[in-house]
Amino acid sequence: MTDLNPTARAAGLRALLHRYNHEYYVLDAPSVPDAEYDRLFRELEALEAAHPELASADSPTRRVGGAPLAAFASVTHRLPMLSLNNVFSDMQDSDPAGRHAELAAFDQRVRDGLGLDEVEYAVEPKFDGLAVSLVYEHGVLVQGATRGDGETGENVTENLRTVRSIPLRLENAPGDDLFAPAVVPARLEVRGEVLMLKRDFERLNSEQDAAGLKRFANPRNAAAGSLRQLDSRITASRRLTFFAYAVAEADGVSLPATHSATMDWLAGLGLPVSRQRSVVRGLAGLTGAYEAMLAQRAGLPFDIDGVVYKVNRLSEQARLGFVSRAPRFAVAHKFPAEEALTVVEDITVQVGRTGAITPVARLQPVFVGGVTVTNATLHNEDEVRRKDVHVGDTVIVRRAGDVIPEVVSVLAERRPPQARAFEMPLVCPVCGSHIVREADEAVARCSGGLYCSAQHKQALQHFASRKALDVEGLGEKLVDQLVDAGLVHTPADLFALDQPALARLERMGDKSAENLVRALDACRHTTLARFVYALGIRNVGEATARDLARHFGTLDALMAADQDMLMTAPDVGPIVARSIVDFFAEAHNREVVDALLAAGVSWPVVETVTSAGVAGVSGKTFVLTGTLPTLGRDDAKARIEAAGGKVTGSVSKKTHYVVAGEAAGSKLDKAHELGITVLDEAALLALLAGNA
């Protein structure tokens, strides 16, 4: 110990440990032995124990984890965490143009959108981990959240504090040989990926083996499971790592002009970024970068499942904007899925929630793409015929998109004499109803409708899923029990369940039953968009349900709409419109809807854009920046959208108004630069009231 007072010594120790931590986990160039780091760490621990008032949120001692949580709190992302669209390459195509046709189409769309002959792209590895958001205020990590559904994630701040490569405090870092120093912004939101290095994954599985516990299938599953531990001490023991790949917000500073320079800027703040990055020009540069990254894949210390390309200039990104839930300026180029040989032991069919009959190959277990595969989809009867798959065949199995296993092809020369062809059954294997196939459809369907328990189960699972009514605690196994016990036949039956009936189910118990009843009661209050999505109408996904709710405003208006009226809604074509008309034309479906409403399912009134439009707001694009005196950001956004306006996250020539509050940052500067009208809160409220 030194003669310094405890406050000064603690501050000095924290600064030293932050520096040594950055050298070890980010720069991979430690300047002191592990024993010296451990000695200083123990000294700081002892100081904070003796003087609790010295403990701080950015102390390295916070990395060891704290007391377990009861549950994770929800976090609404100020800017949605969007996913990327994917492109694939057919590496079996000998023609280079055909091999990368999807990538070429992406490049063409970007060039067309920008009016350029050639575009500069930033290239990065596509990490195979878990997307997270980090928020720093005045350099201190104050919040960490998972991506969740893109709009709402889970608050995993305490767990992320245990990840050694994540700085708890940003510094005006001096930089290193590769990266320049940077200035800490007042508020910074960084997006990145939490993952587990291959060596740490092997170590974890060795520990699982020694403890007699189940092994993790792959590093991604291990990372996701580790980050979502309610006990942060478990997360701390798992040796996760982090790489930043985007800036969502940076208040009080001007970002560099390009994405690649922005990544260098983050590195200057002490945040870890990938060193497998490059900048290329045009399609030839993209394909070359892809081939190079594919060749590096096996030798990298972490798993990647593709390459990410982003238009490098941020001004060009802003011009291209977004479509649905993905940016137009970026794409993920997925690697070819891993393949393996195995034998088809049987071909059965499974029944989907809409009655779709899907042939499934039952396989001799085979390890593909990090998991053991025993089943593979054959899609439909025509696909089985086209690939000529027989029971007994040796086949090549691939994890398409590294997610869904599929049979790619048959090694016909290995077909045994006793191999037998697949015959589509005439009746549903679950309920015995006839299987029918329309002349213009590839998919056969069970005609049993809601009489078929397989459809009951999958329809109920969809109804209760996170993006639908989000019934906490109602998973696949419990749905199976409820249907098999005859307690639930339609979604409306869920709301008639009581605690005594549920408690009698296997492995439920009084507390679990009480929690489910409470969760169901909470789900009675939802939104029209979620309700429409929960009905499971064919071809109506989450985004379409949201568009329908905004366009029609009420369920009655939606149910009464004919095909032509439906096609006036955004992104609704004839196929989707036909599905909606057919769904509500079925009397049983209307009975289910009526029963749900009678059970108390309700939502706030949704005002349509046309009915709520305010002159001066409707059709205009707004950007919010800084802190408004009385309106929260979500409240301001909701009021603008209710009046027919649109709120975006970045300022461009298409922006009509920038609403600026206290501590407005670079967005305000950009507005002045482009000559865009700037409003304060009072002016915004006047505009919304139609008084401007």
UniProtKB/Swiss-Prot annotation:
Ligand binding (NAD(+)): 34-38, 83-84, 124, 147, 193, 310, 334
Q: Which domain of life is it from?
A: Bacteria
Gene Ontology biological process terms, A to Z: DNA repair; DNA replication
Write out the entry's keywords from A to Z.
DNA damage, DNA repair, DNA replication, Ligase, Magnesium, Manganese, Metal-binding, NAD, Zinc
Active-site feature positions: 126
Mind telling me which SMART domains this protein's record contains?
BRCT, HhH1, LIGANc
Q: Where does Zn(2+) bind?
A: 428, 431, 446, 452
Which positions fall inside the BRCT domain?
A: 612-692
Record Pfam families? BRCT (PF00533), DNA_ligase_aden (PF01653), DNA_ligase_OB (PF03120), DNA_ligase_ZBD (PF03119), HHH_2 (PF12826), HHH_5 (PF14520), Nlig-Ia (PF22745)
Query: Which PROSITE patterns does the entry mention?
Result: BRCT, DNA_LIGASE_N1, DNA_LIGASE_N2
**What GO cellular component is one of the record's annotations?**
cytosol
- Gene3D superfamilies per UniProt: 5' to 3' exonuclease, C-terminal subdomain (1.10.150.20), 6.20.10.30, BRCT domain (3.40.50.10190), DNA ligase/mRNA capping enzyme (3.30.470.30), Helix hairpin bin (1.10.287.610), Nucleic acid-binding proteins (2.40.50.140)
**EC number annotated for this UniProt entry:** 6.5.1.2
Which reaction(s) does the protein catalyse, per the Swiss-Prot or TrEMBL entry? NAD(+) + (deoxyribonucleotide)n-3'-hydroxyl + 5'-phospho-(deoxyribonucleotide)m = (deoxyribonucleotide)n+m + AMP + beta-nicotinamide D-nucleotide
The Gene Ontology terms for molecular function here are: DNA binding; DNA ligase (NAD+) activity; metal ion binding
Give the cofactors, semicolon-separated.
Mg(2+); Mn(2+)
> Has keyword Electron transport?
no
NCBIfam families, A to Z: dnlj, PRK07956.1
**What is this protein for, i.e. what is its function?**
DNA ligase that catalyzes the formation of phosphodiester linkages between 5'-phosphoryl and 3'-hydroxyl groups in double-stranded DNA using NAD as a coenzyme and as the energy source for the reaction. It is essential for DNA replication and repair of damaged DNA.
Q: Which family does it belong to?
A: Belongs to the NAD-dependent DNA ligase family. LigA subfamily.
Name the record gives this protein: DNA ligase
What species does this protein belong to? Laribacter hongkongensis (strain HLHK9)
